[in-house]
């Protein structure tokens, strides 16, 4: 059986989505708050370096370039340390998300099959009505002719 998802009119249904991008973003910031701090420190150092360059203060400019490097190092350390610290939790979360995705795929497949059954029933009903109308027309034709 193919792993491609089955098409359905339920694709845009909101109950099939668990976590929005914004929710994921805020969750990741709460899990690893040092990374945004490192980003902020690096950005601040770059901003101060820009201001120093505009003012012509080469000593402050060099100091801010060093601060930018320290900010990058801090951010890199936070990423590596967070990866080590949250590694097991991330593996468990990926397993959970995989199981959740399988459940959602099964729900979508079931909904799609139900939708196909409904459409099939409607088609059969239409064919029966159409056959009955044809029979009535033939009987009326026989009575006339």
From Swiss-Prot:
The chain crosses the membrane at residues 33-50, 69-86. It holds the Pfam family HIG_1_N. GO terms for cellular component: mitochondrial membrane. PROSITE patterns: HIG1. InterPro entries: Hypoxia_induced_domain, RCF1. Residues 6-97 form the HIG1 domain. It is a multi-pass membrane protein. It is found in: Mitochondrion membrane. Keywords: Coiled coil, Membrane, Mitochondrion, Transmembrane, Transmembrane helix. Its main location: mitochondrion. The keyword Membrane applies. The keyword Flavoprotein does not apply. Associates with the respiratory chain complex III/complex IV supercomplex. Cytochrome c oxidase subunit which plays a role in assembly of respiratory supercomplexes. Belongs to the RCF1 family. PANTHER family: HIG1 DOMAIN FAMILY MEMBER 1A (PTHR12297:SF3), HYPOXIA-INDUCBILE GENE 1 HIG1 -RELATED (PTHR12297). This is Respiratory supercomplex factor 1, mitochondrial. It comes from Ajellomyces capsulatus (strain G186AR / H82 / ATCC MYA-2454 / RMSCC 2432).
């Amino acid at each position: 059986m193919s792993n491609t998802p089955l098409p359905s009119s339920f694709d845009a249904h909101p109950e099939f989505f668990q976590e929005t991008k914004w929710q994921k973003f805020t969750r990741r910031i709460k899990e690893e708050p040092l990374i945004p701090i490192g980003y902020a420190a690096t950005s601040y150092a770059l901003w101060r370096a820009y201001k120093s360059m505009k003012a012509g203060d080469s000593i402050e400019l060099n100091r801010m370039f060093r601060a930018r490097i320290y900010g990058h190092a801090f951010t890199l350390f936070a990423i590596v340390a967070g990866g080590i610290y949250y590694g097991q939790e991330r593996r468990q979360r990926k397993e959970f998300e995989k199981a959740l995705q399988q459940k959602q795929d099964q729900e979508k497949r079931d909904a799609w099959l139900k939708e196909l059954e409904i459409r099939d029933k409607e088609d059969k009903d239409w064919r029966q009505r159409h056959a009955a109308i044809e029979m009535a027309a033939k009987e009326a034709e026989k009575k006339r002719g």
